[in-house]
């Protein structure tokens, strides 16, 4: 019969590495969302890690969310857990407006936005300075470049 302490050691060793993203790949992320320089209250910032570097058999890195307060500030926390932080590396950034919120955000910042942010190896600040019509800003930049 196998001694019980051997079974406990096997279970502990089997659990090592199960939370690979816990050790060094998750960092504190805070930030602020402004629209035309004014804080945006009640929107949700989503930070979805680029999964292209996750190989077969590796854990998918968790998506993080943060809801803005009256000053537009947020603190990211992970999906399915009551733990703060976001995955280190390139993250797809989306801003969504929950039902019932009075915040006005251009659809360009939501859904399949093209906005990415690199989360560094230490605590990271993600400040999002939104404009009312990002398509107008892009047109202006294109026209200036053509001159």
Per-region residue spans from a language model:
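Beta-strand-dominated extracellular/periplasmic modules and repeats
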Residues: 18-147
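Sec-dependent bacterial lipoprotein signal peptides
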Residues: 1-16
């Amino acid at each position: 019969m196998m001694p019980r302490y051997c079974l406990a050691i096997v279970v502990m060793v089997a659990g090592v590495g199960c939370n690979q993203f816990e050790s060094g790949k998750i960092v504190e992320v805070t930030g602020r969302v402004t629209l035309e320089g004014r804080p945006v209250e009640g929107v949700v910032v989503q930070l979805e890690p680029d999964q292209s570097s996750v190989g077969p058999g590796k854990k998918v890195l968790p998506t993080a969310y943060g809801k803005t307060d009256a000053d537009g500030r947020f603190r990211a926390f992970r999906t399915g857990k009551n733990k703060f932080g976001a995955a280190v590396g390139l993250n797809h950034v989306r801003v969504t407006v929950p039902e019932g919120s009075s915040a006005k955000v251009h659809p360009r910042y939501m859904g399949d936005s093209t906005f990415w942010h690199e989360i560094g190896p230490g605590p990271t600040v993600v400040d999002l300075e939104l404009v009312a019509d990002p398509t107008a800003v892009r047109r202006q930049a294109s026209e200036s470049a053509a001159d």
